[in-house]
Every structure is written in C-alpha cells, then in structure tokens.
Amino acid sequence: MTKHPALKGIRVLDVSSVLSGPLAAMLLADLGAEVIKVEPPNIPDFTRGTGDARNGMTAYFYNTNRGKRAISVNGRQPEGQRILQQLADQADVLIQNMRPGKASGIGLDPSQCLQRNPALIYASINGYGTVGPMSEEPVYDYVIQAVTGIVDVQRDRASGTADLSHHFPADKITSHALVEAILAALFARERHPDGRGQEVEVSMHEANLAYMWPDAMMQHSIVGDVDGPGIYPGEYYRVYSTIDGAVVVMPLMGPMAGICEAINRPELAKDPRFQALDASNLDEFQDLLAEQISKWTTEETLSAFSEHDVPVGPVIPRNEIHDHPQAKARGSVPEHDVFPVGRIRSARPAWRMKETPELLHQGAPTMGEHTDVVLAELGYLPEEIAALRHVGTVA
C-alpha cells in the first residue's frame, strides 16, 4: 500500500452550500484532498441547523463536511473577495453551487479565476445549466425529481398517484457526477502539455436525466415504432408483507423454479399462465407470492428463499441498518468519538482500493474554526486578522 491517499496534495476550495457541493468536496477529502470550506459570517451552512444535533453539531453537517477545514469570510466585502481570490489562486479545485453568474458577486468569476490560476479546475453545480429558457430558475432537489421522471417512476400503478423519493437523491446524484468530472479534469490536466485546468459544469437536470436513462427510460428511448410492447420490470416489483415485517424478492423476470419451490408451489413453474412473466400475468403471480409470504415471519421468509438461492432481503428500518451483519463484518458503518458531537456513526467511502488508502476523517469543523490558521498561511498577521474580524470581513 502506498503511504498516501490518491489526492494527497490536491487543494480544494469549497464555496458551496447545503448538500450537492459540500458532499462532492467531502468525497474528495475522503480521497485525500485538503478541503477548505467557506461560510459567510453569521450565515452558517443550512445543514448546521437541520436534523439531529448534539453540542451544536448536526449529523447532517457532519455527514457532508467531514475532513474539511472551515473559514468564515464575507465575500460581499472587497477584502473578503481578496481573501477568496487568494485561496482560489492556490487551489487545484474550486467547487460552487450557486445559480449561474452569482459567483461573480463574491469575486469568483470563473474566467477571472482561470486567468489568474490557469491550472484551476473550476467546478460548478447548477440547476438547469448556463443556457436555455430555465437556466436562471431557482432549483431544489424535489423540483429536479419532478422534471427528470423520478417522481413519475414512483407512481403507484393502481391509483396513479405520483410520489417523491423522500430523501434528496437528485442532489447526491449530482455530487457524484461532479466528482467524476473533477477527477477526469485533474487527469486531463496531468496530460495537458501546459498543465492547464478548465471549467467543469454539472447541471442537476442533466445529471439526473443521465441517472434515469439506462433503465427507467428503456421504454422511451427508441424513437418511432418498436418491435412489440416491452415491459419495465421496476414498475412491477413489490414489497411483500410478512407476519412481523416485510421483504423484497428478486428477480421475477428470470428462472422461476426456485421461487415456486420456495413458496411450496413447484407446480407454478410449469403452469401455462406463467411460462413467460410479463405485464399480463406478473400481478397475478405476485399475488400468489404475497399470499404465502404473508403467512410467514420475516425470518421464515428469508430462510425459505435463501434455501433455493433466490435473492431476498428484509426491509430494515433506518435505525437498524448499522447492525446488518454484512455492514458489521465489513466495517461499513464505523463509529467514532468526535468533538463536539461525541459518539457518531457514518458510512465509510464506497470504494476500497488495495494499493491506495481512503481517509475516513473523524471530524467536521465548527463555524470558522480554521479562519485564523488559514489567513496566517496566506500571510496575514494577527493584528490584520483582528482588524478584519472587527469589521465583519471574517469570523
């Protein structure tokens, strides 16, 4: 194993807020990048005040800002803009998720940043992109869910009622798309003869269209006539109630013998009604499946299907997922004692590289925790920092 993580030495300036940008920056920190998070004085990141908290630190903020240093700078003041520009001049990556053009208001216009620091990867998240009739519209996760098909695909087939996905998938999908783009841009910079950086843009709209397209849009990709009516399996899969909980069983589109034997109905595998499962018979077959599962406990259901090598899983409440035996065996949800919040759980990075370690940082910064240290690194004297704090430029 090498002695340092993949992005050791890469400096990231994070002037984003809430979820999409901060999560992307944290993922880079997990890969070893040095990340500085910027918040305006007296305007903490929204996530600092949302959800469960202890001693002033919320789990939401911790889950999106581990491993960063935090400074508090007023980018609306000229001297604050000068500080941000100095940080951008020293950065390898800048991440912002403001509406198009708004970053100029804090002195971080992309063209000017790249003119001063040609090696910079200037990474922007926006709602609909920088061109088009909706490019300046305000956007949040649930709006993007609505316009990219995520809400529609949640629609109940029986009632026709559409529904949201009750977390923020559109933001998180965009975060991961931005990290992909940033890593590619850093690699491209290494190959460029002059080591030049570039602007990188990810719109929430396009990131989530790309996310939906491979499977959820399989019936809406071919333009014009198709060979015959197809089926989108995702519309038919169910959650099955047990005596004491619920399970999910898959697949239903492949060989059925194992499923039929698991529910003690082997004859169904040869039943003419179910020789090919499609829109005409899937509901009927699943009704039979549901009838048997409803007579079993969750443990009995898992045992019956596992015995016949049928993929099955229990519906686990969120407050119990850290106790899943696989999560415990792999250390997927480690616990740490972290100031000021105390004992806290977090999901480890999704990747495992045999020769390059990831960093699961154990701390998230308090508001402006590293302002003085970072300004000192820029060359500011203690009395200059005190003067800036006195006029509200920093905190």
Regions found by a protein language model. Name each.
Residues 1-192, 288, 366, 372-395:
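N-terminal helix-loop segment corresponding to the beta1-alpha1 unit
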